[in-house]
Amino acid sequence: MTSATIPGLDTAPTNHQGLLSWVEEVAELTQPDRVVFTDGSEEEFQRLCDQLVEAGTFIRLNPEKHKNSYLALSDPSDVARVESRTYICSAKEIDAGPTNNWMDPGEMRSIMKDLYRGCMRGRTMYVVPFCMGPLGAEDPKLGVEITDSEYVVVSMRTMTRMGKAALEKMGDDGFFVKALHSVGAPLEPGQKDVAWPCSETKYITHFPETREIWSYGSGYGGNALLGKKCYSLRIASAMAHDEGWLAEHMLILKLISPENKAYYFAAAFPSACGKTNLAMLQPTIPGWRAETLGDDIAWMRFGKDGRLYAVNPEFGFFGVAPGTNWKSNPNAMRTIAAGNTVFTNVALTDDGDVWWEGLEGDPQHLIDWKGNDWYFRETETNAAHPNSRYCTPMSQCPILAPEWDDPQGVPISGILFGGRRKTTVPLVTEARDWQHGVFIGATLGSEQTAAAEGKVGNVRRDPMAMLPFLGYNVGDYFQHWINLGKHADESKLPKVFFVNWFRRGDDGRFLWPGFGENSRVLKWIVDRIEHKAGGATTPIGTVPAVEDLDLDGLDVDAADVAAALAVDADEWRQELPLIEEWLQFVGEKLPTGVKDEFDALKERLG
């Protein structure tokens, strides 16, 4: 079919010529049965959900348990981000840097155009306009995703400000990021579809200079919801580098003291290190309250007053389900319980509810994430996939901060970096200054988890928790952080801290109770910002003594807390060659500032 004969192309609700010609070009290439411009309405959402139920992609959950909620079970080959198939196709290879896969953009376009040719046959092509961050921003960051997946359309409605309002913001000639997605599963006439279409061949490709995303073959999460990691981190980090701001893999937390003073924190942790749990913290210390502004991504820029302001570009939560429960994260559970949630790859109970590992209760029988019968204490595999997800509107969160939709964002008092480390790294450390803070973030190490492909348990360096999400050279990225600090008023820069909730004793148990008790660590951080709290100067930064932490009412052995806070010079000396190996890997673009910090650390450790 030519674009003139594809139904729906002639009824576009926009006069944006750039958008229209791109939509036509993609339709001619991919050959869908029809084109639909999405409007983001409730009616459209319900219609698509009904369609997904009919197709067998969605299972409608018991409305008495989860109203207006659904479960999707993916193909077992399509369950997580595929870092091995994710590319940054900058014009020059050096600009992608050592942490990214690179291919010549011309060559990649040619390969992917061959894959896209006719790939939407038998399917509907949806045009999904969306905005990352508040629609009322001075410079709203707009995008359009073209997709042949209804699952993507309904998820994008939850995760972004999607539909008519975003399209109107574009006007007739506004700039937008082009995001093209196909599951790569064309249907021949009369061919029956599968519940979760995808392809064995997968590419998730970014063209940073032209601000484009091309994704093929996966229907899952970050590979397919292109507003999330692809735009908000990979493309946005390249934009931020060019425009003088930061796009970061960080939660945004508001902490309110008993005196009713608010402090805002941005915190970067690798996947599955408790980012969502901290974002939705329930403080255990009397008089302290927490509110959330986001659990995954922060866009930060300096305001006119010289302070660093953060906004969350997302509109929903796309959280890891296993381990989320009424004890670890009651606020996430309340958000989910409000309904309007799409679950992916969790288990289904006999009464139409969902279940996953770590959730209260021991159901005797379930349908597992692969669609098979699962029996308590008999079936040896997990009922829910370790990277199974809930996709739910942010507006349902009971502790959502009122500023969550403010285009100005919130002023950041402290930046936290953290990872999952059994040894070496203390519970909390304050960086000596901004550049030392950049070094701490740049050399962040964490034991690997299930959210990405790779060997679980290995310590991998994950700079600023951005390793899989950098849209340009990691050395240039470190330099960008250093430069922003140099150009700022030092007295207004956020203080930088490193936390590790996961340190273990010799017997393998956790030394710190974590979860809501982490508010005690945050209280010390606030007191450091206010110049009220003590701490010991160590070779790695300032670390509190046991008595510097407010442990009132906490049933924990002081020796355990001391062990969690210990700085063992021998352990750190063993860490040095691992850090050095990573810095050598960063290569020729490693900033002198980061190298200087490493040399100074070596010297302090003797």
Curated annotation (Swiss-Prot):
Name of the coding gene: pckG
GO cellular component terms attached to this protein's record: cytosol; extracellular region; peptidoglycan-based cell wall; plasma membrane
Catalytic activity field: oxaloacetate + GTP = phosphoenolpyruvate + GDP + CO2
Protein name: Phosphoenolpyruvate carboxykinase [GTP]
Catalytic residue positions: 273
Null mutant phenotype: Cells lacking this gene are unable to grow in the absence of an external carbon source when grown with fatty acids acetate, valerate, or butyrate as the sole carbon source. This mutant also fails to replicate in mouse lungs. PEPCK depletion during the chronic phase of infection results in mycobacterial clearance.
Location relative to the cell: Cytoplasm
Requisite cofactors: Mn(2+)
Broad enzyme group: lyase
NCBIfam families xrefs: PRK04210.1 (NF003253)
Note on cofactor: Binds 1 Mn(2+) ion per subunit.
UniProt-listed SUPFAM superfamilies: PEP carboxykinase N-terminal domain, PEP carboxykinase-like
Annotated keywords: Acetylation, Cytoplasm, Decarboxylase, Gluconeogenesis, GTP-binding, Lyase, Manganese, Metal-binding, Nucleotide-binding
Protein's GO biological process: cellular response to glucose stimulus; cellular response to iron ion starvation; gluconeogenesis; glycerol biosynthetic process from pyruvate; oxaloacetate metabolic process; propionate catabolic process; response to lipid; response to starvation
Native source species: Mycobacterium tuberculosis (strain ATCC 25618 / H37Rv)
Note from the entry: The number of CD4 T-cells is increased in the PEPCK immunized mice although the change of the number of CD8 T-cells is not significant. The cytokines IFN-gamma (IFNG), IL-12 (IL12A or IL12B) and TNF-alpha (TNF) are increased significantly in the mice immunized with PEPCK relative to those immunized with incomplete adjuvant.
Molecular-function GO terms, alphabetical: GTP binding; manganese ion binding; phosphoenolpyruvate carboxykinase (GTP) activity
Post-translational modification N-acetylthreonine, affected residues: 2
Assembly description: Monomer.
Protein residues bound to GTP: 272-277, 389, 420, 515-518
Positions with a binding annotation for Mn(2+): 229, 249, 296
